[in-house]
Amino acid sequence: VHGDIKSSNIMVKRTGNAKIIDIGSALALDDMPPNRTCTPSYAAPEVLEGRENTPRSDLASLGYVLIEMLAGKPPFAGLQSYRDLLESKRSLAHRLPQMLPADVTCNELLMNFIRGMIASDPARRFPSAEDADLVKEGAASFHRQLIVGGLASEYDNEIRAWLELLE
């Protein structure tokens, strides 16, 4: 578990491949300390509530980064209270159509992928980074869609690379 995935902890190489940095905060699942620090705006709801930080928590954090990239701004900017932040995370999936550009929201595969990353209930998120990549609504399917549509670019591996780093 990385435990602090956020946009400033993801670096993109010239080749277009993404690298998650600040691995010093990562811990084995069986060696989790009782108190951990995190960046609240990127932490999953269950982490903010003091529950266990799991690989699914990292997926939610990565989903928030993806939304930030697609929207061009952090999804939780300007929130002043813990309660507002938590409520905003819980309602995020329903607010995506208002937050994201139309060319993103019209892509059902991409929207389902995002929702599978950020579901407020961890049990409704992808079970693992591998699943987030390989299942029907996963990153690999979206990548194939880009290739078929002639929309793949030299940076088309970013999402998949992040997921591979979480595996």
Language-model segments: what does each one mean?
Residues 34-47:
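Conserved activation segment of eukaryotic-like protein kinases, specifically the C-terminal portion
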Residues 1-12:
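Catalytic-loop of the protein kinase fold
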Residues 121-124, 130-144:
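Terminal C-lobe "cap" of eukaryotic-type protein kinase domains
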Residues 104-118:
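Conserved C-terminal C-lobe helix
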Residues 143-167:
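Regulatory extensions appended to serine/threonine kinase catalytic cores
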Residues 58:
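Conserved catalytic-loop aspartate of Hanks-type protein kinases
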